[in-house]
């Protein structure tokens, strides 16, 4: 986007609806006032809507169309909440202004000039058979899993790269976007990318703050920021199921680090980041590996305890209000799509938008619970809601309510 700003084709202060007039949000004021800059700052007030690509396979334009149904968590620019789909919207703006799909634009403007020959904007464009395999821990065992579909999320996080190519990108960013043949951005535009723009509250920052104790945490154009040992650091993680990454900078020392992992939420990435800063610039003997292992072990233990507490609240010896066949059928919602429930071998099966499935066994009363087909998703919980006549009228599936 900064390149288009430098070319005079767009301004950071321009309204999004002037480029995407069909892009409507739940709050008309936010729709009217949302600026290009806001797309990168997670300050719109619109809550997380990742279910639009984790529970369905729909084109980017349809995902954005459904955003009009996502209720805001707060008013525009009044706080911070992470929202991937605004980066999808930014990709659509880039296509509208440049006349090229986002993936073609970054290939031409970034990957090719930097010689990033083993980098692809989406996995389907990878020509190399030597590809990472994602892994997940399921039932205390680590197993390979299938790739997350990335064709719709595009500009929100679908770039695939190699260690060598990421080094080229990192060096370019540390050197004010310069490369052998010129520079990607004008100096002022490059500087704007790293200028703090939004305060990040503790609840929205990484748990690492419990160990590094930053005095401030901010967000710039695609970068989390904090102070560490009196110095500003810029960094960002990346995660798809079974895959992790982190890219960080210590600008005062022209030091950068990147970590790729083929295991879901391999938080050693944070330990390596701070250890690299200590080793190569800021000194320090902190055993970040031990400290982060202890921190995240407690976090994971808390999650596990929550699951056990949920299991313990099950009311035994209850029965569903209706015959299982009465729970079958199609349930729909303009935002969440269509779920279909069928009955097989006395067990309910749910199909989520023809994208994912789960087995639902009776839990208690009119609540059913069971494993997803992709077992690394864990277990699904569905509560059926009856109307005044005693018939099933709705389903509440993991907080998503659909009508029969």
Predicted segments, located by residue:
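Catalytic loop of the DD-peptidase/beta-lactamase superfamily, centered on the K-T-G motif
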Residues: 95-101, 107-108, 112, 144-404
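Second-shell loop/turn segments in exported
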Residues: 24-27, 49-54, 75-79, 92-96, ...
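The feature captures the short pre-catalytic strand/loop hairpin that immediately precedes
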Residues: 61-73, 137-151, 227
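Mid-domain, small-residue-enriched loop/turn segments at the edges of structured enzyme/sensor domains
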Residues: 35, 85-86
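Active-site helix/loop module of the DD-peptidase/beta-lactamase fold
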Residues: 3-47, 68-71, 92, 96-134, ...
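Extracellular/periplasmic catalytic domains that process cell-envelope and extracellular macromolecules
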Residues: 11, 27-33, 74, 126-128, ...
